[in-house]
From Swiss-Prot:
GO CC annotations on file: ribonucleoprotein complex; ribosome
Matches recorded under HAMAP family: Ribosomal_eS17 (MF_00511)
Family: Belongs to the eukaryotic ribosomal protein eS17 family.
Organism of this sequence: Korarchaeum cryptofilum (strain OPF8)
Protein name (record): Small ribosomal subunit protein eS17
GO biological process: translation
Protein encoded by which gene: rps17e
Pfam families for the chain: Ribosomal_S17e
Keywords from the named record: Ribonucleoprotein, Ribosomal protein
């Protein structure tokens, strides 16, 4: 079974992907860097979880399984 993420992480990730659709890629390190530039997130753990979920959303978008 996969990791269940907090609702707040999902909410922020969906909002950022919708607001800046062309900035994100399937590369976690790239997404982490972009997230640091456009959002002021003080917690490194929180930033990494959001970047990881955005990465997962982009992979699902490519595979055609994103609803």
């Amino acid at each position: 079974m996969g990791t269940v993420r907090e609702r707040a992480i999902k909410r922020v990730a969906y909002k950022l992907v919708k607001q800046y659709p062309d900035l994100w890629t399937e590369d976690f390190e790239h997404n982490k860097m972009i997230l640091s530039q456009i959002a002021e997130i003080k917690s490194k753990v929180y930033r990494n979880r959001i970047a990881g979920y955005i990465t997962r959303l982009k992979v699902r978008e490519r595979q055609g399984t994103l609803v």
